[in-house]
Every structure is written in C-alpha cells, then in structure tokens.
Amino acid sequence: GSEMCIRDRLRGTEQKKSNFWGHQRKLSKSWYDGSTGLLPLDDCIKSAVKDGYSHHIPRLMVICNLMNMCEIDPKFIYKWFMEMYIDASDWVMIPNVFGMATYSDGGLMSTKPYTCSSNYILKMSNYEKGAWCDVIDGLYWRFVQKNISFYSSNPRLSFQTRVLSRMSEDRKVLIFKKAEEFLETHTQS
C-alpha cells in the first residue's frame, strides 16, 4: 500500500537525477522550432509544437532516440518534453525519459536503450531515404561505438557491435562526419 507508493516515489526522485551515459550536451533552438534538417525529427517537433502531443512511437523512437544519441543531458530532454506536451506529468515523463527512452537510470526499467538507425524509421513510416538517413545512421553508429563495451556485454545489443565491425571504413568516415557536423550545429556543449 502506502509503503510501496513511497518507495516508488523515491525511486522516481532518484531516476530523475540519473545520467548513466554521462551526457552533457544541451539542445539548440532547432529542437524547438523543427529546423534540424532531419525530416522525421522536424516533422515530430512541428507536430508537438502544433498539437502539444504525439504518439508514443514518435516520442520514443524519433525524438528521444535522437536526443539520446546526440548526448543531450537527460534533464534537458525531460525539460523539453515537459514544455512541449499537453499530457506532460512527472509520473509519465520521468519513467519515459530517464528510463525507457534514454536508459539514463542504468536499467531500472528496461534492459537496453531505445536507439535505432534510419532503417527502423524508414520501416515504421512513409519517409523515403534521403540525406537525413546518413546523419541518423552516423549518430546511431557513433553511439554504439562510444558505448561498445556496454553494447558488447548486453545480449540484446551485442550483434550491433558485429555489424559495426563489418561496416566499411569509407561508410564509417562518411556517416561519423555527418554526425559530428549535426552535433556541432544542433547541440551546445
């Protein structure tokens, strides 16, 4: 009863302070007006601005995914969602942002971060391949590479390290460059 409620509230308080990955970047203005140049992300942001709402999948697999892969400090991700969504409330946003979406709590709620490349977005939407794919792929594979020991030791993610190791050096150079350019333009250190 009340003991469980208090324990869960304390867990939420701790979860809100978590930053498993140690991310420190901040969002630039483009994350508020939908001018990042990544079509799926910009559409999701503009929808949030217009409606104050979006389905769970765009929230999780587009917006949070990209914020996490851009190394945005989770407290700024949480702040963004609290500002942008009409249904924003701690009981929703703390577990969604710090737990499920970013894995900032280190696995209190989930066994892995929800990260994906452009392939998932293409499969789950009507978007066509474009320049945005290389940027998202660069952010994704950069995240995997930076966290290679975590990915290697997680049974649900270890196959990604093998995919990365087989990727051509030319492809890596191209997409990592696109990722770094995006980070430089659309995040603040």
Residue positions per predicted region:
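C-terminal substrate/ligand-recognition segments
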Residues: 55, 68-69
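Short, small-residue-biased leader/transition segments that mark boundaries at the very start
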Residues: 1-6
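Secretory-pathway/luminal and periplasmic proteins that interact with or process carbohydrate-rich
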Residues: 7, 71-72, 89-92
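Active-site-adjacent "gating/activation" loops or surface patches in catalytic cores
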Residues: 11-50, 54
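C-terminal, helix-dominated tail/subdomain
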Residues: 21, 26, 82-171
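Short acidic alpha-helical/loop segments enriched in Asp/Glu that coordinate divalent cations
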Residues: 10-18, 60, 74-83, 93-95
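Beta-rich accessory regions
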Residues: 163-189
